[in-house]
Regions:
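Glycine/proline-enriched, intrinsically flexible loops and inter-domain linkers
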Residues: 1-34, 39-188, 192-430
Length: 430
């Protein structure tokens, strides 16, 4: 998008149709030039912003049908030119949407922090180049990818040759299906049986689908190697256009990144017979009003494997976050944490048991709006090799059951309770 970039330039993007995930995940990219101003590398940082606009606080609307309902889109916007941060341009972009960002000051601070993080990366890369030289650094970058490709090929070779199929469904019935063809040290992953893109926001951009595949390959390797595209070299991935896993531009995608990604992992692990399903959702919770916005994901149970019971109360697979401590939550927001505990008995029984989910109970202390985007409320995390499925999750407001995705106004004294799913068990229960 910017082939004429110069030293001191920095760019920002969150476009789900150009390598992004969903709009709150904003990527800042700093080109790295040599002393002759030749572009050699790029350093990037991606951070989840608390709010980038959209129809609900937290930019995770349960019922969005268009991308513009989910917030502001940065399409490779120039953030810094010749070392000068362009605050006015960023402010205009944050305010230009039909549903503008609610706290642009926070966005600006986060973007400046990402620019600073990139600068640290550029500095460290510079030290590496000074010590070893460009040719050696380039060579070892290639070696890292070659090593990843070799280890992935070795891991694939340990799998049984042939065709492995699996499918699962989201709570609305949408099917995610995969066929994996293993041939020696290579494989083809084909999602052709997956349903078309949906009207809602469960569509997963192609980049999210590839990321889920890469994650499973990295798990398959089982060694502490840097995550990189070399893992994909022995693998061919087929994703049908205009499907749930590769929607056309303009489709809403907020839940695809956080929910459908989990189901992609579930079907891949199921096809390969590696693990029972983990909770299969991020249990996305947002709340706020005109003064603040808060977003968190809630942990649940992990699926059991052939050698281990599932862990309880943990974030699994695509989540990559932690639950906020009750003390921090109560100090910063008008919320009282009434309960935060394991959901005992929610893990699926088996020779090896699935992990238990969590119970998170919040009392609201002032008027606000909350939203929940969750899955595994009607479908249950599958067991493997005769193991029982984990318990489905539940969302309740003042004791009344809610749908798996909901947004509502609440007032002082209202209590929200989220019970997260357990993981599936492995093997026939004793």
């Amino acid at each position: 998008a910017h082939p004429d970039c110069e030293p001191g330039d920095v760019f920002v993007t969150n476009d789900p149709y150009a390598g992004g995930s969903h709009l709150p995940d904003i990527t800042v990219v700093t080109p790295v030039h040599d002393e002759s101003a030749v572009l050699r590398f790029a350093v990037a940082s991606r951070g989840h912003h608390a709010d980038v606009g959209g129809v609900t606080p937290g930019s995770m609307p349960p019922f969005s049908t268009r991308l513009d309902e989910e917030g502001v889109v940065f399409e490779a916007l120039q953030l810094v030119k010749a070392g000068v941060f362009d605050e006015n341009r960023v402010r205009k972009t944050l305010d230009a949407s039909v549903y503008p960002a609610r706290n642009p000051e926070e966005n600006l601070a986060d973007l400046q922090a990402q620019v600073a993080a990139n600068e640290k990366g550029v500095h460290l890369l510079g030290r590496l180049l000074e010590r070893y030289g460009l040719d050696v650094v380039n060579a070892y970058m290639q070696h890292i990818q070659d090593n990843a490709a070799e280890l992935t090929a070795q891991a694939i070779e340990r799998l049984a040759d042939g065709v492995h199929r699996f499918e699962d469904r989201l709570d609305d019935g949408t099917r995610v299906a995969v066929e994996i063809r293993v041939d020696g040290d290579s494989m083809e992953i084909d999602f052709s049986g997956t349903d078309p893109a949906v009207e809602g926001n469960l569509n997963a951009p192609r980049a999210v689908t590839i990321a889920a595949v890469l994650y499973v390959l990295r798990v398959l390797v089982g060694k502490p190697i840097p995550l990189n595209s070399g893992c994909l070299r022995p693998v061919r991935v087929r994703i049908p256009d205009d499907s749930l896993l590769s929607p056309a531009r303009g489709h809403a995608v907020a839940s695809g990144n956080v929910e459908t990604s989990q189901r992609i992992v579930d079907v891949l692990l199921g096809a390969l017979g590696l693990a029972a399903a983990s909770q299969g959702t991020m249990n996305n919770l947002t709340f706020g009003n005109e003064d603040f916005a808060y977003y968190e994901t809630l942990a649940g149970g992990a699926g059991a494997t052939a050698t281990k019971t599932g862990a309880s109360g943990v974030h699994t697979h695509m989540t990559n976050s932690k639950c906020t401590d009750p003390e921090v939550l109560e100090t910063r927001f008008p919320i009282r944490v009434r309960r935060f505990s394991l959901r005992h008995g929610s893990g699926g029984e088996g020779a090896l048991r699935g992990g238990d989910g969590l119970v998170r109970e919040l009392e609201f202390l002032e008027p606000m709006r909350f939203s929940i985007v969750s899955e595994r409320r009607t479908t249950r995390p599958y067991g493997m090799r005769g193991g029982d499925p984990g318990a489905a999750g539940m969302n309740l407001l003042n004791g009344k059951a809610l749908e798996h995705r909901v947004t509502a106004e609440v007032g002082p004294g209202d209590v929200l309770r989220v019970e997260t799913p357990g993981g599936g068990g492995w093997g026939t229960p004793p």
